Amino acid sequence: MKMFKKIMAVALVGVMALSMLTGCAVTNAIIEDKAETALENAWSTEKNENVNFKSGKFTSKDAYTKTKKDVVNGIIKVEEGKAKLSTYSDANYTVVVVAEPSSAKKVKNWNGLAKTVLVTANWNNGIYVNGTNSKTAKVDIVTGIKGKNATEDKDDTYTIFVFAKSETAYNNK
């Protein structure tokens, strides 16, 4: 009976850990989706054309990894409502960092910030748009990155947008 209790305790700990891990992943996916929708809304409003932002997989790129490291180490800090172009952006990728808005699971809380992100990325010069009638752009949005607050010495949560800036990056699988 003692062995059964020990096994069940270990199983319970495993189940709880798994549920916590997947819960965070689901939350980040929701936030990323809302941010992506806000980018599409901002582009449509400002440029009067529809661009579908597709998810790219650019987190293995130097531009992203160096930017994330600087956010985590408190080197890059961004005030709420503003965006910062990463110095690690290069010929293929444009990297923009923002402080995550409160209630980031709602599109309306990303709307103003999405325009700021696009302006910081320099619209068409910093974001490769493919197609003529059905336009698409690729972005990798990573949320929930812990860093330091821009105005106070406390923790803050950041989101990093990595846009394909060139056709080469856009076609990169």
Predicted feature residues:
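Intrinsic-disorder/low-complexity peptide segments enriched for small residues
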Residues: 16-19, 83, 111, 116
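A well-ordered secondary-structure block
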Residues: 87-173
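Gram-positive cell-envelope targeting signals
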Residues: 1-35
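Phenylalanine-focused residue identity feature
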Residues: 4, 53, 58, 161-163
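Intrinsically disordered, low-complexity segments enriched in small/polar residues
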Residues: 12, 21, 54, 79, ...
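Generic low-polarity alpha-helical segments
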Residues: 16, 63-68, 129-132, 173
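Short, well-ordered surface patches within globular domains
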Residues: 26-93
